Amino acid sequence: MSVSVKRISTGTQVVAALPASEDPVEFPAEYFAKNPGKIPVFISTRLDLDKLRQYVYMGLTTGEVNVCHINSYLYRVLQNIEDEARDNWVSFRVTIAAKDTTVRLFDMLEVKEYAGLVPDGKENANLTQTVDEWLPMYILGLQRVGRATDERYRGDLYDHLCAQCKLKSPSFESLGNPADNNYASWINDSNFLKLVAAIDMFFHHFKKHEEAVIRFGTITSRFKDCAALSTMAHLVKVTGMPVEEVMTWVLNKPVEDEVCRMMTPGQEIDKADSYMPYLIDFGLSTKSPYSSVKNPCFHFWGQLTAVLVNSARARNARVPDDIPYQELTQAALLFAYATGRSSDLAQRFVLHNKEYIKAAPDASDNSEREESKEAPTTRDVVEWLAWWDDIGQVRTRDMEVFARRAVHGILDPREKSIGAYARGYFA
């Protein structure tokens, strides 16, 4: 919808427009509306498991493994893992399993034959089935290691992976060097990513399954590119407020718009066994509506609020580019200050019927508080906005002291992080 402004000198209307520089987001429900049914994945089933085991093992050893061999091997060796559905497992009207029936690992997918060329690989006739005890976990762990950008962290992940594989099977042997990072050619393959998502989805549903330890390598698939949703969940934790109350503290138009888009109904955000958390790896969306990239104002406001209420985790969140920092900073400080000055302390249990009854508020006390412009002691956003207007929407000295105290412990923060921004702004 175009908007016009009036040119004063001539009285003519001028259309105000900006270039459409961003691709629109894609919601998971939209995918299933266009593509009802299980998610297709293309796997070659022409090679037997013995050959695939050799091709994958030798390919990882030489750094020349073929993604078709990886996909076929994972499917072959894991396809018979199963459990019993305690309830109907349905997502976006797709029935994955009926109650009290056996569900297999890849039942959320529709497996189709891969029609492309599948090359031969290097053989090793000495390999036995004992390799299958650890090789799938090793492969899936390598894709997690390969996504790590920090060299030290990548090395630590690889060490943890090897330790997990060794626990799973004493016959484990490392087949490569994490520094080589030869996994980029296959960790971005769409069929491989669908297998990764399916494996994590199954074992997230059946957390107590004896093979669930394999999630070490797949867990990053869940809620990939959903950092803004994680920010919302983190805000709920650090403020102690329910999500609906947190939303009443949204005071900026850009944040409002982003929250409304994230809360688009029918997307199964709060359904734990849904396809939704895997919207990227399942190919349901190429532009996540829940990423920090698409919700930069909400992400910044939420993480800055968390920093100001002393969340160590929020300090390392990255500062987005080109957002209204000043406006968002004011809103975050007011929210954090209200959280810090109030509490939800109340007697929850009684002994011998000794219950504290709070006295009714005195009208004279309220009028005195209004005259002195004392800050509220509740978390009611209406009371706080009234107070904010009363003081002329200018930070008080106590608010500044509160902020300085919150950032005092931030030492050597990461460059371009929320922690670095907060320390530079408030210290």
From Swiss-Prot:
GO cellular component, one term: host cell cytoplasm
Pfam family name, one: Rhabdo_ncap
The keyword DNA repair appears for this protein: no
Segments for region (Interaction with the phosphoprotein): 351-396
Gene Ontology MF annotations: RNA binding
InterPro entries noted in UniProt: Rhabdo_ncapsid, Rhabdovirus_ncapsid_C, Rhabdovirus_ncapsid_N, Rhabdovirus_nucleoprotein-like
Sequence positions that bind RNA: 144, 153, 207, 215, 287, 318, 414
Keywords: Capsid protein, Helical capsid protein, Host cytoplasm, Ribonucleoprotein, RNA-binding, Viral nucleoprotein, Virion
Subcellular location: Virion; Host cytoplasm
UniProt-listed SUPFAM superfamilies: Rhabdovirus nucleoprotein-like (SSF140809)
Role description: Encapsidates the genome in a ratio of one N per nine ribonucleotides, protecting it from nucleases. The encapsidated genomic RNA is termed the NC and serves as template for transcription and replication. The nucleocapsid is bullet-shaped with the tip containing 8 turns of a conical spiral before reaching the helical cylindrical trunk. Nucleocapsid assembly is concomitant with replication, therefore viral replication depends on the intracellular concentration of free N, termed N(0). All replicative products are resistant to nucleases.
Protein family according to the UniProt entry: Belongs to the vesiculovirus nucleocapsid protein family.
Subunit structure: Homomultimerizes to form the nucleocapsid. Binds to viral genomic RNA; this interaction contributes to the virion assembly. N in the nucleocapsid interacts (via C-terminus) with the P protein (via C-terminus); this interaction allows to package the L polymerase in the virion and positions the polymerase on the template, since P acts as a bridge between N and L. N(0) interacts with the P protein; this interaction prevents the uncontrolled aggregation of N(0). Interacts with the matrix protein (inner layer); this interaction contributes to the virion assembly. Interacts with the L polymerase.
Protein name according to UniProt: Nucleoprotein
Gene source species: Piry virus
Gene name of this polypeptide: N
